[in-house]
């Protein structure tokens, strides 16, 4: 795997810390990368910022559901290469594949601009049939953006081709 850390464990009392990816209901993976963004940067900061806010989370949902029995494992961040998007995409796909291998866990990725969608979906699709539900102000269906096929502007197009 290409992870920067050994992980962060459970999320401040929300859920129960799983011992391994195979024990987890939910796997959390940070992707601190915004090298595919064409405009304002900042998605690379999302994993750390989201984790810093988990202290505000409660173990009961707004509907009253008890979430404390959900087994969560935060496995850390993908080790990204700020100046080499293709190397980063390989690391994302390899990390996602490795942590999902042999599990029924749900992967939740945090951070990254839209360009990280393609390598995540490639890894998830190895498990079987995969679908995508896309919410965005625009469809991100460009074939290329400034000559790059894996930009934020082509994420949904690559997802359609992958799934």
What is the predicted function of each stretch?
Residues 2-163:
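Conserved alpha-helical scaffold segments that buttress catalytic/binding sites
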